[in-house]
Amino acid sequence: MIKNSLVITFFLFLLSGCASEVDKRVDTVLSISGANRTDLETVLKHYKHEPQKLKAAKFLIANMRYHHSYYSVKNPRQHPLLDSLTKAADSLFYHSVYMATDSFHNGNIQKLIDSVRIGFRKQNDVRVSEQSVKIFWKEDYDFNWITAKQLINHIDHVFEWKRQMNSVRRLSTEDFYEYVLPYRSIPDNSLTDFSDIYFAFMDKYLKDLDKDSVQNVVQRYNFVINQLCKFFPLYPYEEEIGYQELFFYGFHDCIPIASYGVSILRACGIPAAVEFNACYKQFQGRHYHGVVLDKNGNWLAFNPESSIPTSDNSSFDTKDILNIYRFMFSEQKDTPFFMEKNGEYVPDIFDSPFLKDVTSHLLKTIPLILPYRETGNNNLAYLAAFNSGVPSGIIPVTWGKINRTKQNVTFSSVIPDRYYFPVYYSPFGKSFSFGEPFYLDKDGKIIKSHIEGKVDDVTLLRKFPVKQGLVDKAVKLIGTVIQASNDPGFQPCDTVGIIADTLQPYFQDIKLDMNKGPYQYYQIKTTDEYPHAALSELEFITDIRYGYENVIAASPLPILSSGDTLSEDKTEVRLMDEPLERIKWKAEYDGNPQTSPEPYPTIRFMLKKPQFVTKIRMMPLNADNGIIAGNQYELFCWNNGEWKKILSERARYNYITVSIPSGSLLWLRNLTGGKEELPFYVDSDGRQKFIYP
């Protein structure tokens, strides 16, 4: 009995300690809330006889300290016409759907919706932009502006779900507070509407569903949003307006899409959160997505408006992403925001008190301990990943705590099969290396490149590796034939050429057999196994000595080495079946290596009279990441925590020659065009080896 009493006493002590801590934080927020203190205290007094709601109110107020954003000062005259039209569209769509009693996605329902939508747009497309919206924005901390009425309405609404829904009642207190109760889903994101608005808009579409099936709920949400935005033209305004943005195409990126999706699902009783990946392995940018908590306690990832969560997350592509962070409403004490030493620089991506690393729910992660022997007072070091979309060329993706006694740093959440740059930051935000960049293989083994002191002359041909998917398409073009005939129906025809090898991602020639020529009609015919003309550029080459009038200058073949400069054939010209200006709309003649007539099996070239075509100069569909003559390039070398420029040059040919220390990690930038870039080494055979193949 004594032992049990001690346990109970200790538990009550913990509870009182937690309560005391929350009360202290509430008092702190009240002390800095100025004129709005009365509103916040009104909320606490309102719930003094409802202990559960009082605890919820304290949780929200205690965590307001760092929540800050633009918010909308609403008034009835803000956008009355838009309010009227969106309500009308919502009502028309809702009644169209529920006039039928069979499947929500039945084709007959879709026909009815389309009919109603067409009529609505005829009447209102022009009206939408007749009246400009007048949004009055202010920027402030939440504790300075959220009113008692807004907070009480929100808390009452959320607790009504707790009363009605078993799934909400089953949630732990922590999950309820973090994933249903919050009035915002992304910190610092503009706040225009609260849960009562979102509920009134969406819940009527969900009443016939079992909300334990989060997949069905998300599928219905996606259907509703994708249908309603067809009732309006492209977004005509220059600023945010609130949830009515969902009625339009053309304004959203993934951030508001995720924010609205999660906020609306929460307002309808579905535990949800917004997450983002720090960056990608090879590409610029990052992505925000949603997650929902299913009845089995599993977090399922999805993209609001465009994808449905699956029970094993197999539909969510994770192969190219770095660490995943979830936005919480409460302060997360194990983040750099709180762990930094006074004056220590925290990278922008981690300068938030609301981040939680949740990478392991979608990807394998491992702990990693690295040596750290740098001087200074930093508490934190970082593993960064390459990203060409930021000036520094790197983005920190995870943090580690420095142990100066053991001279190491421990990272708790590191993804294998990724390339990392170990860095720390000065108080002014300058990055420095505390180790050489390395690849962490799938087994968690660190692999480093050996950098030698000698200087080598190397030839660079690309700024980004050839994409395997495009290589696969080029391989499938093997067996494609070039046929020629003097009959427009190609009956009969001669096979005058064939693609016998894998085409490289630049111009190359296929020689044609003209022993029976000349011919009036030519066609490139793909195989039955792969009936797709994935050829980005085509030129039909003839000899200038034939004296044909329907010719223009041919594009040069690539010059990939100094020896190629001697091989130019000045007798080659391009034969035309129509003036270039008339055919530039065609993918194979538009000058863009990234487009092709891939949907079609055949490309035809129809002359006015028989003429000799000696070669076809062709290029397979490709990402255009080779060196382009005439483009301006910069070459950087990784050195002690930063990319240092070692070359700036306008490419004369399709290669660049430079002297570099053997084994150096390099980054080649095209300043003229294109975004895809990736660091590389040059191996002992002079070949570029990108950090990801």
Residue ranges of predicted features:
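Secondary-structure boundary elements
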Residues: 31, 39-42, 49-249, 285
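C-terminal motif of bacterial Sec signal peptides marking the signal peptidase cleavage site
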Residues: 16-17
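Structured interaction patches on ligand/partner-binding surfaces of diverse proteins
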Residues: 427-453, 540, 680-688
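Short acidic/polar inter-strand loop motif in beta-rich domains
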Residues: 425-435, 528-534, 672-678
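Hydrophobic/aromatic-rich core segments of domains that either
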Residues: 25-34, 42-52, 111-114, 204-224, ...
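Disordered, acidic Ser/Thr/Pro-rich linker "stalks" and the adjacent N-terminal cap
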Residues: 453-508, 514-517, 530-615, 619-628, ...
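A short, amphipathic beta-strand motif
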Residues: 364-375
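Short Pro-Gly-centered beta-turn/loop motif in secreted/extracellular proteins
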Residues: 406-421, 425-428, 516-518, 659-662
